[in-house]
Amino acid sequence: MALKHFNPITPGQRQLVIVDRSELYKGKPVKSLTEGLSKKGGRNNTGRITVRFQGGGHKRSYRFIDFKRRKLDVVGTVERLEYDPNRTAFIALIRYTDGELAYILAPQRLAVGDQVVAGNSVDVKPGNAMPLSSMPVGTIIHNVELKPGKGGQIARSAGTYAQLVGRDQGMAILRLNSGEQRLVSGACFASVGAVSNPDHGNINDGKAGRSVWRGKRPHVRGVAMNPVDHPHGGGEGRTSGGRHPVTPWGKPTKGKKTRSNKATDKFIMRSRHQRKK
């Protein structure tokens, strides 16, 4: 889908660039596949702010997405492509031959009327799902599981994908968008193709209000605060903060490594931080 630019008849339209969604379905989502979504405003169950700068935004309903794709060898037809306010990718409504409806992540080049199927030996075409052990090396994939049966966790954002680059002792070797290479069990399912809406990275909101509509409030810099509010606060006139960057609670940030999950280090063959040769 193309990008839309606007004549600047208001200041907020001068820089505005959005994705043209005219080809998507205009109506409401399937009611049986949605539920209400209550606003948290960045608060936890005690009412305290645990994530700053969140709140407000347009009301949403949550669409249940089938990330597991375990309805094996049942052909489904794409009824329509829809917008989903809860993610950057578009979603596709699938009607299976037994009458069941489901939402899946829409890959690129998936069109209304196309047929998709999940199984152990199915064609390698966009929207089909199969175990990594059944895919040819070099396949572009998305919605990749990390644990068999848990549902896809990798490559779910707009325009993202992973590539199957090899196999080793029942494990699949994947190259991710970040440059990381990692091992994943060959029994894990993945869907073929790259995720839809690749132009998402080119949009320009044009005004602060569009972030507010999404529930994002103004992100205040620490150096603009008072000393009581942030370690970088205070000082006469503008200052640099006077120390290495820290969080409001004094922990180092901006480049400080935070990964502590040593248990899965052995599955990462090449770190995303490794210098490109």
Swiss-Prot record:
GO cellular component annotations of the record: large ribosomal subunit
Subunit description: Part of the 50S ribosomal subunit. Forms a bridge to the 30S subunit in the 70S ribosome.
GO molecular function terms noted in the UniProt entry: rRNA binding; structural constituent of ribosome; transferase activity
UniProt name for this protein: Large ribosomal subunit protein uL2
Pfam families found in the cross-reference section: Ribosomal_L2 (PF00181), Ribosomal_L2_C (PF03947)
Region (Disordered): 222-277
GO biological process: cytoplasmic translation
Biological function: One of the primary rRNA binding proteins. Required for association of the 30S and 50S subunits to form the 70S ribosome, for tRNA binding and peptide bond formation. It has been suggested to have peptidyltransferase activity; this is somewhat controversial. Makes several contacts with the 16S rRNA in the 70S ribosome.
UniProtKB keywords: Ribonucleoprotein, Ribosomal protein, RNA-binding, rRNA-binding
Family: Belongs to the universal ribosomal protein uL2 family.
Top-level taxon of origin: Bacteria
